[in-house]
A protein has these predicted regions:
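Short terminal alpha-helical segments
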Residues: 3-27
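Residue-level detector of alpha-helical transmembrane segments in integral membrane proteins
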Residues: 2, 16-17, 56, 80
């Protein structure tokens, strides 16, 4: 087992449980995205504190965390590509 801190486990589980409550459908994805802001800080704290090996382990152990991560990646790519517009005051 990969050693995770108690905080990493707790935060990964919080994000996992949030993302897992929505069905893996287009509507479920929309619901996930509507409330994702409240979980971004926990998500980022895990990402910033985990090694690549730890992140791989977290994504295997917490599929909801992985789903959340994939959506954050898609959003970031959409913003970078100019497909998603971000208001200038953000």
């Amino acid at each position: 087992m990969i050693d995770l801190t108690a905080e990493q486990q707790q935060l990964a589980k919080i994000v996992h449980e949030y993302a897992s409550q929505f069905p893996p459908t287009e509507n479920g994805d929309a619901q996930l995205l509507q409330g994702c802001y409240d979980y971004m800080e926990a998500f980022k704290r895990v990402m910033d504190s985990a090694s690549k090996v730890q992140m791989d382990y977290i994504c295997l152990q917490y599929p909801g965390y992985f789903r959340f991560a994939k959506w954050m990646e898609r959003l970031a790519q959409g913003i970078a590509d100019g497909v998603i517009e971000v208001p200038k005051d953000h």
